[in-house]
Amino acid sequence: MINLRKTHPLMKIINHSFIDLPAPSNISAWWNFGSLLGICLVIQILTGLFLAMHYTSDTLTAFSSVAHICRDVNYGWLIRNLHANGTSMFFMCLFLHVGRGIYYGSYLYKETWNIGVILLLTVMATAFVGYVLPWGQMSFWGATVITNLLSAIPYIGTTLAEWIWGGFAVDKATLTRFFAFHFILPFIIMALVIVHLLFLHETGSNNPSGINPDSDKIPFHPYYTIKDALGLMFLLLILLSLAFFSPDSLGDPDNFSPANPLNTPPHIKPEWYFLFAYAILRSIPNKLGGVLALLASILILLIIPFLHTANQRSMMFRPISQTLFWILTANLITLTWIGGQPVEQPFIIIGQLASILYFTLILILLPLAGLFENYMLEPQR
């Protein structure tokens, strides 16, 4: 009998992508996060679908519809907690996935990397519009502050902001369209994920050593399906622990109050996964300058492949670059902390120094370290 998975047109695609896929024999647990992101996306789409069945995107009823989901819908509290905390898990996996790509030189697969950066931006946009939907205080003021940044664009800024709002301020029209965006974007993300995998399977996976692994490949199944299953169990353990025992620990207490345009919260701040970019935005006193720095903090990922100066692909055998990478990691954690602090000294100066260091590390120090390591590895006369 002919093996169906190798002959059936649909099964053949799945077989070449997840079963008989030749994978490097030495990829570590850092390569688990791609599959975990796929699982996170599926969890978010499924829980989101059930939430959308009971949610109403109207300024008068949005907040109470979320309360209704938690109180009256069967397991509504669980669906909502999984969806809210699933976002945090999604971003945790995203940051680790991007960090892995930078550390091991995966960005040299330029098409895969660029689609990945577009995916990151799309996920950030989806999370932002989703945060507005419960229509709590922080939802409303977060939407107001972030959409207001568009007005910093010269000449067309104010018109653009009002066009996004559908009026002269964040109101019913804004909430309705944000719900529409939040519903459609995950499906666009799914399409982009397929393109991301398509480009990845053109070249094959990178590996920790950064050298060509063609001479030593093993089938994806059962070796890496088992390994991914272990990662999935850890992910679900953390997500379910959060959802059951501490569902509100990552949220903002202000969001338990319904949106009130007449009362501004003392500290307007986004969810934790945006705080590093928010800190960079706030570190520049000029509005337009802040917006440009905010965009640059993410879009800088697109030029990382062109800043690679080292003869070796991975940082595995490059101690100076390794040190700078971990300084960059610590710097991003510092920025995340600063983004959640009030705008006063010493937080202002720490944020400004951390923002300067962020761009200096990526644009200047890491490329220089690559060149220096090349020089050190050359045979000395």
Curated annotation (Swiss-Prot):
Protein name according to UniProt: Cytochrome b
Organism per entry: Sminthopsis dolichura (Little long-tailed dunnart)
Keywords: Electron transport, Heme, Iron, Membrane, Metal-binding, Mitochondrion, Mitochondrion inner membrane, Respiratory chain, Transmembrane, Transmembrane helix, Transport, Ubiquinone
Cofactor names: heme b
Record's subcellular location: Mitochondrion inner membrane
Function according to Swiss-Prot or TrEMBL: Component of the ubiquinol-cytochrome c reductase complex (complex III or cytochrome b-c1 complex) that is part of the mitochondrial respiratory chain. The b-c1 complex mediates electron transfer from ubiquinol to cytochrome c. Contributes to the generation of a proton gradient across the mitochondrial membrane that is then used for ATP synthesis.
Membrane topology: Multi-pass membrane protein
Note: Heme 1 (or BL or b562) is low-potential and absorbs at about 562 nm, and heme 2 (or BH or b566) is high-potential and absorbs at about 566 nm.
